[in-house]
């Protein structure tokens, strides 16, 4: 946001310098292009992996920005994208991490932790994914939450493992280590026990 405002303070320059230092020497490649089709993504990823066999992860940000050429129903077209990325991962033997938006239904529930059914056009995405991870921060909905500064990574699907929640400290856009038990107690505080009531005989 500071970059877009073009107003850099000394602290901003220090943060930028630190960030560049973290990225320097790391094998991270970005393709900043719009309206890429699934076929173009597959070709780009495969060509890159041939040139750089050490490639360990492909990230798509985000799924519904991929250009759809099919004239089929939109949900079916999204299914084609999902299956295509699955094929890419298997063919290249490289994990593909695809970000996806949520439907607005989550906003209408008391418990706003996202579920698999909240994924837009979720049927095919949920079926094809090996792992689904949902991010949640209680302070977004409850500013006075005891879990302020804590992010939940909820594993809602794990084809070859267990489901559960991993907690991270969320600071300045970064996920940092945190004591899991402490974070859990703040994120899901135990209900106070109510005194027992006895009926008169």
Please provide the spans of the model-predicted regions.
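Cytosolic-facing regulatory segments adjacent to core modules
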Residues: 1-54, 68, 166-167, 178
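Generic marker of residues within folded, mature protein domains
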Residues: 20, 143-145, 158
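Basic/aromatic-rich interaction segments and small domains that mediate binding to polyanionic partners
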Residues: 162
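Conserved GTP-binding G-domain of TRAFAC-class P-loop NTPases and closely related GTPase folds
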Residues: 152-158
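Active-site donor-binding loop signature of nucleotide-sugar glycosyltransferases
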Residues: 33, 157, 170
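Alpha-helical context
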Residues: 6, 17-21, 61, 108, ...
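P-loop NTPase motor core
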Residues: 33-152, 174-176, 182-201
């Amino acid at each position: 946001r500071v970059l877009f405002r073009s107003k850099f303070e000394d602290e901003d320059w220090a943060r930028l310098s630190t960030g560049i230092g973290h990225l320097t020497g790391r094998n991270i490649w970005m393709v900043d292009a719009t309206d890429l089709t699934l076929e173009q993504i597959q070709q780009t990823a495969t060509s890159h992996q041939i040139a750089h066999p050490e490639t360990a992860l492909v990230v798509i940000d985000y799924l519904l920005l991929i250009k759809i050429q099919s004239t089929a129903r939109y949900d079916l077209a999204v299914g084609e994208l999902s299956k295509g990325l699955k094929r890419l991962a298997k063919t290249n033997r490289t994990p593909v991490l695809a970000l996806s938006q949520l439907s607005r239904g989550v906003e209408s529930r008391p418990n706003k932790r996202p579920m698999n059914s909240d994924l837009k056009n979720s049927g095919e995405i949920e079926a094809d994914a090996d792992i689904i991870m949902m991010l949640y921060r209680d302070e977004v909905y409850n500013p006075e939450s005891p879990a302020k500064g804590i992010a939940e990574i909820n594993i809602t699907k794990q084809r070859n493992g267990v489901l559960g929640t991993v907690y991270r400290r969320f600071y300045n856009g970064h996920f940092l280590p945190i004591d899991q038990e402490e974070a859990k107690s703040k994120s899901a505080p135990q209900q106070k026990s109510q005194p027992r009531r006895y009926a008169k005989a």
